[in-house]
Amino acid sequence: MKLLLFTALVLVVIVSLIEAEAENERACLAEYKVCTDDTGNCCSNLVCDCYRRSKHGVPKGRSCFCLEKDVRYTREI
């Protein structure tokens, strides 16, 4: 009986460690993927960059994307 309880306890510990490790290594967002203000969800070589959208001078919201660090994007007119 003690061996059965010990085995069950060991299995529970192993499963919880595996789940914790998987959560720590969650997938990051690739370049040009939509992100939030949190910088932690983009991959390490990227940063979550946000800009305000507008149409005919009327604000339409905010968009955020994972972009390369230290790169400036401009719109050609």
UniProtKB/Swiss-Prot annotation:
One of its GO terms (cellular component) is extracellular region. Transmembrane segments: none annotated. Expressed by the venom gland. Residues 21-26 form a propeptide. Its main location: secreted. Contains 4 disulfide bonds. It holds the Pfam family Toxin_35. It comes from the Eukaryota. Keywords: Disulfide bond, Secreted, Signal, Toxin. One of its GO terms (molecular function) is toxin activity. Residues 1-20 form the signal peptide. It is found in: Secreted. Belongs to the neurotoxin 19 (CSTX) family. 08 (U8-Lctx) subfamily. This is U9-lycotoxin-Ls1a. It comes from Lycosa singoriensis (Wolf spider).
